[in-house]
Amino acid sequence: MTTNYIFVTGGVVSSLGKGIAAASLAAILEARGLKVTMMKLDPYINVDPGTMSPTQHGEVFVTEDGAETDLDLGHYERFIRTKMTKRNNFTAGRVYEEVLRKERRGDYLGATIQVIPHITNEIKERVIAGSEGHDIAIVEVGGTVGDIESLPFMEAIRQLAVQKGRERTMFMHLTLVPYLAAAGEVKTKPTQHSVKELRSIGIQPDILICRSDRVIPANERAKIALFCNVQEKAVISMKDVDSIYKIPQLIKAQGLDDFVCKRFGITAPEANLAEWEQVIYEEANPTDEVTIGMVGKYIELPDAYKSVNEALKHAGLKNRLSVKIKYIDSQDVEAKGFEMLEGLDAILVPGGFGSRGIEGKIRTAQYARENKIPYLGICLGMQVALIEFARNVAGLADAHSTEFNAETKNPVVGLITEWVDSEGKVEERTENSNLGGTMRLGSQLCHLKNGSKARELYGNASIHERHRHRYEVNNNLLPQLEKAGLKISGLSADKKLVEIIEMPNHPWFVAAQFHPEFTSTPRDGHPLFEGFVKAAGQQLRGELK
């Protein structure tokens, strides 16, 4: 199969939405029956985002095969059916690490290692390997044109266009077209300068996606086309919208998919966007609004919980409910008490690391349990629920996780020292292992217990969900917890690790060690989130029993 490439770059400012724009184009092309994949190239020196601060970088998205990747891969999976893998995201750090490994091994036969050709060749090889077996590969380069760290990536995609042929490659550039109220018009000069910068490194864009807070007039688009040497029909106006799921229709209406197919010589049926039309309809026509409290420690940057936010919205669509997320700092719960949690229809405690705010999360789980508020715990959210139950129901007053208190006499949560990874290999860890790349990662099999809420929600005896954790329930203390009423409703494939717990005498209290948010999509939703938001609606109406 011959693969065609669309390279996506950004200019003027960061955070223009390259990932959303690229994913929206991919969704349209997929709707035309084409096999599409996507890649994200990140110019930073970290090997992967696994150890980066969520408040700087946003969430770490975990793929089925256990790669810790950029949050844009979450957008890709929410817009297209293709599942991302470790091949779909790599960083400058990963590239340099591999080149240096090859140099130490002697693979370069004593050559002087340079950015060109060694670094650029490594980038090209990874792009080609990650795109095999697809009609179109859309490759997004992180950062902004002109950034010094992105230059090797820009040079690599320039070379790829030469090697693969311009008939098989396209460049799509996102740029800002600001509106100046004082002048009463949009200004195209920033776009012109951004394209000039791109052309100075040998890349002529074929498509310009022009971001603005309004529709860009036809005469301004013609002006951009003239000065940037781009066909007028390839200058796409992408205005701000109230839902990212409207963007596929927005750019299809301007014929971008037709332009791409014609350029690549691809004959494909018209895109069927009925599923996206249904998503937009459900989003625009909720029957009620529920308020869900998300109690976390990274709330100053909502993107730290991007997939959770989106999964809640998806579940709202399936229940015809608008979901209002109230972000609550777990440290505020510690300082101000339960008053921070009053008036919520449901409570969600997401994943996280470190001891800051941990007691606030434990108290949150207590409040939800005692007041019969629907509760969904994810990863750490399950562990704090377990700690709270052990302390206040099972009578283990000093129960804790060894992550936060290594000296606790009742470690209900401890470090996993051995497990089988997603490829079937045995992994071993100790307290002294590196932080990066040392967690239980990727899709894992989970067996669900008959008669449990989890089994009812999923409708299956076994499921696969994605993990990202290094601490797990201590099986030695499970008998005491189960005797006190704790329900274990999900176990790992070898039945050694607890995956899901449920609380007794509670209408809806489910907590999972895995991350269900990573597999939720706007078209399909996710059973755990759908059940959770449904329970929130019942709580709102006073119907939850």
Curated annotation (Swiss-Prot):
GO cellular component: cytosol
Pathway(s) of this molecule: Pyrimidine metabolism; CTP biosynthesis via de novo pathway; CTP from UDP: step 2/2
Residues that bind ATP: 15-20, 72, 239-241
Positions bound to L-glutamine: 352, 380-383, 403, 470
Residues annotated to bind Mg(2+): 72, 140
One of the GO biological process terms: 'de novo' CTP biosynthetic process
Chain residue ranges for the region called Amidoligase domain: 1-266
Reaction(s) catalysed by this chain's protein: UTP + L-glutamine + ATP + H2O = CTP + L-glutamate + ADP + phosphate + 2 H(+); L-glutamine + H2O = L-glutamate + NH4(+); UTP + NH4(+) + ATP = CTP + ADP + phosphate + 2 H(+)
Enzyme nomenclature, EC number: 6.3.4.2
Residues given in the record as CTP binding sites: 14, 147-149, 187-192, 223
InterPro entries hit by this protein: Class_I_gatase-like, CTP_synthase, CTP_synthase_N, GATASE, GATase1_CTP_Synthase, P-loop_NTPase
Binding site for UTP: 14, 187-192, 223
Residue ranges occupied by any Glutamine amidotransferase type-1 domain in the UniProt entry: 291-542
Regulation: Allosterically activated by GTP, when glutamine is the substrate; GTP has no effect on the reaction when ammonia is the substrate. The allosteric effector GTP functions by stabilizing the protein conformation that binds the tetrahedral intermediate(s) formed during glutamine hydrolysis. Inhibited by the product CTP, via allosteric rather than competitive inhibition.
Top-level enzyme category: ligase
Catalytic residues as annotated in Swiss-Prot or TrEMBL: 379, 515, 517
Keywords: ATP-binding, Glutamine amidotransferase, Ligase, Magnesium, Metal-binding, Nucleotide-binding, Pyrimidine biosynthesis
Note: CTPSs have evolved a hybrid strategy for distinguishing between UTP and CTP. The overlapping regions of the product feedback inhibitory and substrate sites recognize a common feature in both compounds, the triphosphate moiety. To differentiate isosteric substrate and product pyrimidine rings, an additional pocket far from the expected kinase/ligase catalytic site, specifically recognizes the cytosine and ribose portions of the product inhibitor.
NCBIfam families xrefs: PRK05380.1, PyrG
Protein family per UniProt: Belongs to the CTP synthase family.
Function field: Catalyzes the ATP-dependent amination of UTP to CTP with either L-glutamine or ammonia as the source of nitrogen. Regulates intracellular CTP levels through interactions with the four ribonucleotide triphosphates.
Record text on subunit structure and interactions: Homotetramer.
Protein name as catalogued: CTP synthase
